[in-house]
Amino acid sequence: MWNIRRGKQRREYSILKKQTALILSVLACLSFLISSCGKIETKEIENENSHDNVEFIPKSKPAGSEAKYKISLEMDEKGKFRVNSTSKIKNISTDHWKELVFYFIPNIFTKPNSPQLATPSYVSIKSIKVDGEKVKFNLEKDTLKIKLGQELKPNHEVIVNVQYDFTLPKKGLRFTANEKNYFLAQWYPMIATYRDHKWNKEDYRMRGETYHTAFSDFEIQYKLSNNLTIISSSDDDTYPSGKSGILVGKDIKDFYIALLKEPNVVEKKIGNITIRVFGVDDRKDLHKDIMKLAIDALTYFQDTIGPYPHKQLDIILDELGMEYPGVVTANSIYRGTPVDEDSLKSMVIHEIAHQWFYGVISNDPYHDAWLDEGLANFASRLFYAQYQGEEITVNEEMYKDFPLPVNLSLDEYSLKEQSTYIYGKSQEMLWKVFQENKGEQQAENFLGEYYENYKFKEIDTNEFIRFLKNYLNLNNDSYFEGWIKLEK
């Protein structure tokens, strides 16, 4: 167990720093007024923390589109789902829209798009309406384009209704099912972001996250025919679950649902946050160990970065490691074999860190994947340094054969090397910057300030570097040469 007082000291340091900045600003104004009257001659005071004297104004990337979702979800005894999705879409760009573009990821796992799957998904769109009128649409792979009868002007909105049925594939990616459980990731039509006068929608890839959505509000009404435990991005789901109910999510990037049959459940309450671990194997002692680790990680991340944004943290020990608002998954079993405990625990910590880097501070995971993956690894590394009492070291030599920048778009990396850049090289080189600028304590303070400036905003690489340079008082880009591609 690390010293929790350190987190409090960091918060106190941050408050003191802001108070000091305010006092210095007031004194500077008074000095100017006095000197302008010719009464006292003052000298400019130099301060090594120049960012304390100059207010930094964060710049977020606008989403271009805004959505509120109201969805009904029904499941029959055979595992077939029926969905009625109604979304209020608002144009918050400066352009007039002739069409709407949605991600519709269930279609990627149908037989035509995933012929390698022995049990693909089934998808059937029954109707699409805009403001109550049926419209033409085109569905190709995971891209759903809906034609508008008349242009949608800036600051205007439309109501889009999509009715469809689907089944889950077996051995899909995140959107999948196994013998007992159902995992509904990106299961509804998700409006894309809009920027640079076009829809920001990229082709689906089987590695990395290719979907990018803005913060939205959700209301999900569900009805199940089977006795399943429902776990979701809402704080309203309970254990044991009922067969029907309403789930609400506010200011979240997407809405995840898992349906589990008879999981082993470990539950603890830490302050006003309930942590729940759902295990699907018989390693009950491991599930308890994961709970202890999750409590430590949540406490550290809250003390270091900022408040956890939900009332529940659900950890599902099944399926691949992945983050969703309020939920993380980590595969305790891979290809029929139990995953070793250390790997599983590391996976859980990384995904919990994503609740801040992705869940609260947003970035485009196709064009700036390193900003959430690299920062999640960076924060996890700091946690383990405290948790295990180990010194953090830099090993640049490990990445000498990987010369590309870490902030390229996913399609600019080979599938084999993509993770090495996004997860590995990014956090290693970022740690080198802090190693040469006051080290671990500075890194922890930075994460808190970063969160405070960009919570519920979207950031890109250039803005991250602008903030980092301001925070560390860096006068040039020499620290980023060779690993960051900066726009001039």
Residue ranges of predicted features:
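Amphipathic alpha-helical substructures
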Residues: 426-488
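Solvent-exposed beta-hairpin/edge-strand motifs
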Residues: 49, 99-133, 185, 223, ...
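Asparagine-centered strand-capping/turn motif at beta-strand->loop junctions
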Residues: 89-93
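Juxtacatalytic substrate-recognition/specificity segment
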Residues: 220, 246, 264-355, 359-364, ...
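A surface-exposed beta-strand-loop module
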Residues: 117-181
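N-terminal, polar/Ser/Thr-rich
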Residues: 28, 37-82
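Post-HExxH zinc-binding segment in Zn-dependent metallohydrolases
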Residues: 327-336, 368-406, 480
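Extended, low-hydrophobicity, Ser/Thr/Pro/Gly-biased non-transmembrane segments
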Residues: 126, 163-256
